[in-house]
Every structure is written in C-alpha cells, then in structure tokens.
C-alpha cells in the first residue's frame, strides 16, 4: 500500500490502495487544549477514500466509516451512527473552522449559505465532520483544504449516509473546497448557492 500524509509525504505502493494520514488535524485546537482536533485516517484509491476514521484520543472517541456503514466507539459505549434526516436549510446547523473560510469569494459563498441557516458555528476543525456523521450537524463548508484534511472525513461521512463534494458538485478528495452534507436534499440546497461563487 502507498502512504500519503501531512507528516510523511508520499511513499509509493503496489496494491492500488493509499493510506492517507493526518496525525493532528486542528493544530490550533490541539495547542489550545480544546478537543476539536483529531487523528484522520483514510484508505482508498484514485477514486477517493473507501474507509475513513476520525479519532479524538483526548476524549476517547472514534468515528469509523466504511462502505457497510459507520460506527462510533467512545467512553460511554459504541454503536452505529448515521447522518441527520432531511430538513430545509432554514432549519440547518452549519459548521466551518474559521470565520474567514478562505479567499474573499469563498467567505462570501459560505456566508450566503450561513445566512439562510438556523445556526452557524465556528472552530470545530475535524470534529465538525464527526458531528455531521453522528447526526448532530447538517452541513460543514470549508475551503483551502489539503487532501489529507478531507479524505478521512469523506470516508466517514459516506459510510454514515452523507455526501461530500467540492463547491461545484465534483469530487473533494484532492482538497480545496468541500461541502459535506447530511443528505442529498440539503446538499443540493447548499450547492445551488455555492455554485454561484466559482
């Protein structure tokens, strides 16, 4: 297997599979002592991740997504998880890491979605994606991502029944802009807005 990661660079393999690793996603959260950071692991091929893990070792929570489904393991038990059921954007909870999101255009795109949502939250790093997979959040919108920032969350969210694309509806596993959604309906609603910000 090949390996690619923030700390490791790229090491080639022969199986067609690549492990994508980010040992501390959310460095600012880690440094400040907030449990919003995590370890990201993905296994996939050129088409994208098939398995995704978000692990928060400080509070002992692990979220695992595979093509067969998604599971949570934590100090109070374990079990299957899935994304939220359909709700309109005006009832949605939207997360991003930084209020400035990315470029001025990307910030405007995020704000165009956020102003239509019921609740907007900032500063959750990779833990926002875990909350989406577990059914607590409707949308996570980010920009300026590296592939190792998003591949673990993609595998997890797909396993939990959600969708992750770029802001034009294409694949997001190579990094850049990401729109993670709990279900196809709210994804379509947010995507229709974000497509206006190329």
Protein language model regions, located:
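An extended, acidic
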Residues: 82-198
């Amino acid at each position: 297997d090949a390996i690619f990661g923030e700390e490791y660079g790229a090491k080639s393999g022969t199986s067609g599979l690549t492990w994508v690793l980010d040992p501390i996603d959310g460095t600012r959260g880690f440094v400040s002592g907030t449990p919003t950071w995590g370890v990201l692991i993905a296994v996939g091929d050129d088409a994208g991740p098939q398995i995704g893990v978000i692990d928060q070792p400080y509070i002992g929570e692990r979220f695992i997504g595979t093509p067969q489904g998604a599971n949570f393991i934590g100090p109070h038990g374990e079990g299957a998880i899935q994304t939220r059921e359909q709700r309109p954007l005006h009832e949605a909870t939207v997360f991003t890491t930084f209020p400035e999101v990315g470029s001025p255009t990307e910030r405007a795109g995020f704000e165009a979605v956020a102003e239509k949502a019921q609740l907007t939250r900032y500063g959750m790093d990779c833990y926002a994606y875990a909350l989406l997979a577990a059914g607590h959040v409707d949308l996570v919108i980010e920009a300026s991502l590296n592939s190792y920032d998003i591949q673990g969350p993609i595998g997890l969210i797909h396993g939990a029944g959600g969708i992750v694309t770029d802001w034009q509806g294409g694949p997001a596993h190579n990094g850049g802009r990401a729109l993670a959604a709990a279900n196809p309906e709210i994804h379509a609603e947010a995507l229709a807005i974000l497509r206006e910000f190329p």
